[in-house]
């Protein structure tokens, strides 16, 4: 969220309290809105259906909307490093994190994995570790 939005609305103290704030929603191609996912400091997962009239379909649009003070965004921290450093965005709920390890790479068979596919899988795993370490 932008500092201006935080001054106006305050800060949430838990993911569940996000329902009391104007959030920027993300829409899947199906039209369904994304439920924000969190892991608590104690390791408990939770999901929140946030409120807000603005619905976007890209990280770029979500970041721009948040910088403009239109609400709270939910994006990977690595995508907003510059904005956080510059002070145009403020990180909220620092004790909670996104369960980024919950994704899969599907491929036909483990018996004969082509070298390019093996390289891709290795790269995806490395990217995931990088995101989780932030």
Task: Annotate each predicted stretch with a short phrase.
Residues 3-5, 28, 41-42, 109-111:
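Short loop segments at secondary-structure junctions
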Residues 77-82, 86, 96-134:
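C-terminal effector-binding regulatory domain of bacterial HTH transcription factors
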Residues 22-42:
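Secondary-structure junction motif
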Residues 14-16, 27-28, 45-46, 81, ...:
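Short secondary-structure boundary/capping segments
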Residues 47-91, 98, 113:
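Hydrophobic hinge/microswitch elements
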Residues 16, 63-64, 118:
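Alpha-helical segments flanking ligand/cofactor-binding loops in enzyme cores
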Residues 1-26:
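Flexible hinge/capping segments at coil-to-helix
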């Amino acid at each position: 969220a932008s500092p201006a939005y935080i001054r106006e609305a305050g800060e949430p103290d838990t993911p569940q309290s996000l329902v009391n704030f104007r959030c920027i929603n993300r829409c899947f191609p199906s039209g369904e809105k994304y439920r924000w996912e969190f892991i608590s400091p104690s390791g408990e997962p939770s999901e929140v259906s946030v409120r807000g009239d603005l619905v976007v379909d890209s990280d770029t649009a979500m970041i721009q909307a948040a910088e403009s003070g239109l609400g709270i965004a939910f994006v990977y921290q690595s995508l907003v490093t510059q904005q956080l450093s510059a002070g145009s965005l403020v990180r909220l709920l620092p004790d909670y994190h996104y369960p980024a390890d919950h994704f899969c790479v599907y491929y036909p068979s483990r018996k004969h994995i082509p070298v390019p596919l093996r390289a891709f899988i290795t790269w995806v795993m490395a990217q995931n570790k990088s995101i989780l370490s932030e």
